[in-house]
Regions:
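A residue-level marker of the well-folded mature domains of exported/periplasmic proteins
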Residues: 1-159
Protein backbone atom coordinates (compact mmCIF):
# COMPACT_ATOMS: atom_id res chain seq x y z
CA UNK A 1 0.00 0.00 0.00
CA UNK A 2 1.25 3.45 -0.85
CA UNK A 3 0.00 6.19 1.46
CA UNK A 4 0.49 9.86 0.62
CA UNK A 5 -0.32 12.57 3.12
CA UNK A 6 -0.72 16.29 2.51
CA UNK A 7 -1.63 18.89 5.09
CA UNK A 8 -3.98 21.22 3.24
CA UNK A 9 -3.48 24.28 5.50
CA UNK A 10 -6.93 25.46 4.39
CA UNK A 11 -10.49 24.21 4.29
CA UNK A 12 -11.13 25.99 0.99
CA UNK A 13 -11.67 24.39 -2.39
CA UNK A 14 -9.08 25.43 -4.97
CA UNK A 15 -8.00 24.73 -8.53
CA UNK A 16 -4.50 24.00 -7.20
CA UNK A 17 -5.81 21.22 -4.97
CA UNK A 18 -7.98 19.83 -7.77
CA UNK A 19 -4.95 19.78 -10.10
CA UNK A 20 -2.80 18.07 -7.48
CA UNK A 21 -5.50 15.46 -6.73
CA UNK A 22 -5.95 14.85 -10.47
CA UNK A 23 -2.22 14.18 -10.69
CA UNK A 24 -2.46 11.67 -7.87
CA UNK A 25 -5.31 9.85 -9.59
CA UNK A 26 -3.48 9.93 -12.94
CA UNK A 27 -0.46 8.33 -11.24
CA UNK A 28 -2.43 5.44 -9.79
CA UNK A 29 -4.07 6.69 -6.61
CA UNK A 30 -7.40 4.93 -6.23
CA UNK A 31 -8.93 6.69 -3.22
CA UNK A 32 -8.37 10.03 -1.49
CA UNK A 33 -9.64 10.69 2.04
CA UNK A 34 -10.71 14.31 1.63
CA UNK A 35 -10.61 15.54 5.20
CA UNK A 36 -11.03 19.28 5.41
CA UNK A 37 -14.27 21.15 4.78
CA UNK A 38 -14.75 22.49 1.26
CA UNK A 39 -11.48 20.99 0.01
CA UNK A 40 -13.72 17.94 -0.50
CA UNK A 41 -15.19 19.70 -3.55
CA UNK A 42 -11.79 19.92 -5.25
CA UNK A 43 -10.95 16.28 -4.56
CA UNK A 44 -14.40 15.08 -5.66
CA UNK A 45 -14.07 17.04 -8.92
CA UNK A 46 -10.65 15.48 -9.54
CA UNK A 47 -12.05 12.02 -8.75
CA UNK A 48 -14.95 12.52 -11.16
CA UNK A 49 -12.57 13.57 -13.94
CA UNK A 50 -10.24 10.61 -13.36
CA UNK A 51 -12.55 7.72 -12.44
CA UNK A 52 -11.29 7.95 -8.86
CA UNK A 53 -12.95 7.52 -5.49
CA UNK A 54 -13.27 9.68 -2.39
CA UNK A 55 -13.82 8.99 1.30
CA UNK A 56 -15.82 11.81 2.85
CA UNK A 57 -15.47 13.08 6.39
CA UNK A 58 -17.57 14.14 9.39
CA UNK A 59 -20.98 13.36 7.81
CA UNK A 60 -22.25 11.12 5.01
CA UNK A 61 -21.04 13.03 1.93
CA UNK A 62 -22.41 10.55 -0.62
CA UNK A 63 -25.11 13.02 -1.69
CA UNK A 64 -22.41 15.50 -2.72
CA UNK A 65 -20.63 13.31 -5.29
CA UNK A 66 -21.06 9.96 -7.00
CA UNK A 67 -17.34 9.39 -6.35
CA UNK A 68 -17.86 8.93 -2.58
CA UNK A 69 -17.40 5.28 -1.57
CA UNK A 70 -17.96 5.95 2.14
CA UNK A 71 -17.51 8.66 4.76
CA UNK A 72 -15.75 8.62 8.12
CA UNK A 73 -18.50 10.09 10.26
CA UNK A 74 -18.40 11.75 13.64
CA UNK A 75 -21.30 10.76 15.87
CA UNK A 76 -22.09 14.39 16.58
CA UNK A 77 -25.54 13.73 18.01
CA UNK A 78 -24.27 11.00 20.34
CA UNK A 79 -21.34 13.09 21.57
CA UNK A 80 -23.49 16.18 22.22
CA UNK A 81 -26.07 14.07 24.05
CA UNK A 82 -23.28 12.46 26.09
CA UNK A 83 -21.87 15.86 27.13
CA UNK A 84 -25.32 17.30 27.87
CA UNK A 85 -26.04 14.23 29.98
CA UNK A 86 -22.98 15.10 32.08
CA UNK A 87 -24.44 18.57 32.66
CA UNK A 88 -27.83 17.23 33.69
CA UNK A 89 -26.49 14.48 35.98
CA UNK A 90 -24.15 16.92 37.72
CA UNK A 91 -20.91 15.31 36.58
CA UNK A 92 -19.80 17.84 33.94
CA UNK A 93 -16.94 18.94 36.21
CA UNK A 94 -15.35 15.53 35.48
CA UNK A 95 -15.02 16.40 31.78
CA UNK A 96 -15.19 20.19 31.59
CA UNK A 97 -11.88 21.66 30.45
CA UNK A 98 -10.44 18.24 29.63
CA UNK A 99 -9.66 16.33 26.46
CA UNK A 100 -12.10 13.46 25.96
CA UNK A 101 -11.90 10.76 23.30
CA UNK A 102 -15.13 9.08 22.31
CA UNK A 103 -15.25 6.11 19.97
CA UNK A 104 -17.22 3.09 18.83
CA UNK A 105 -18.46 2.17 22.30
CA UNK A 106 -19.93 5.67 22.59
CA UNK A 107 -21.54 5.59 19.11
CA UNK A 108 -19.31 8.58 18.32
CA UNK A 109 -17.76 7.29 15.07
CA UNK A 110 -19.02 5.29 12.15
CA UNK A 111 -19.57 4.70 8.47
CA UNK A 112 -22.89 5.39 6.72
CA UNK A 113 -24.65 2.09 6.12
CA UNK A 114 -27.75 3.49 4.37
CA UNK A 115 -25.64 4.64 1.42
CA UNK A 116 -23.15 1.74 1.45
CA UNK A 117 -21.25 1.36 -1.83
CA UNK A 118 -18.21 -0.68 -0.82
CA UNK A 119 -18.16 -3.90 -2.82
CA UNK A 120 -15.60 -6.11 -1.06
CA UNK A 121 -16.70 -5.37 2.49
CA UNK A 122 -20.35 -5.72 3.51
CA UNK A 123 -22.51 -3.85 6.00
CA UNK A 124 -22.67 -7.07 8.03
CA UNK A 125 -18.85 -7.25 8.04
CA UNK A 126 -18.69 -3.63 9.16
CA UNK A 127 -21.33 -4.04 11.88
CA UNK A 128 -19.53 -7.12 13.24
CA UNK A 129 -16.23 -5.24 13.38
CA UNK A 130 -17.84 -2.16 14.96
CA UNK A 131 -19.49 -4.34 17.62
CA UNK A 132 -16.10 -5.87 18.48
CA UNK A 133 -14.58 -2.40 18.73
CA UNK A 134 -17.45 -1.26 20.96
CA UNK A 135 -17.16 -4.25 23.32
CA UNK A 136 -13.37 -4.01 23.48
CA UNK A 137 -12.59 -7.36 21.86
CA UNK A 138 -11.01 -5.51 18.91
CA UNK A 139 -8.66 -2.72 19.92
CA UNK A 140 -7.48 -0.18 17.38
CA UNK A 141 -3.94 0.79 18.29
CA UNK A 142 -2.30 3.78 16.63
CA UNK A 143 1.21 2.69 17.64
CA UNK A 144 2.62 1.50 14.32
CA UNK A 145 5.87 0.44 16.03
CA UNK A 146 3.98 -2.62 17.32
CA UNK A 147 3.36 -3.90 13.79
CA UNK A 148 5.19 -7.05 12.76
CA UNK A 149 6.22 -5.34 9.55
CA UNK A 150 5.66 -2.17 7.57
CA UNK A 151 7.47 -3.53 4.51
CA UNK A 152 4.31 -3.34 2.40
CA UNK A 153 3.61 0.28 3.37
CA UNK A 154 5.14 3.32 1.72
CA UNK A 155 4.45 6.73 3.26
CA UNK A 156 4.91 9.87 1.16
CA UNK A 157 4.66 13.21 2.95
CA UNK A 158 3.70 15.77 0.30
CA UNK A 159 4.87 19.32 0.96
Amino acid sequence: MNYSWLYGASFAASTELQTMASGWYENGTEVIFACGGNMFQSVAAAAAANDGAVVGVDVDQSSQSDTVITSAMKGLSASVQWACGKVYDGSFDEIGGTFVTLGAKDNAVGLPTATWSLTKWTVDDYNAMLAKMADGSLVVDNDYSKLDSTDSLTLNLVK
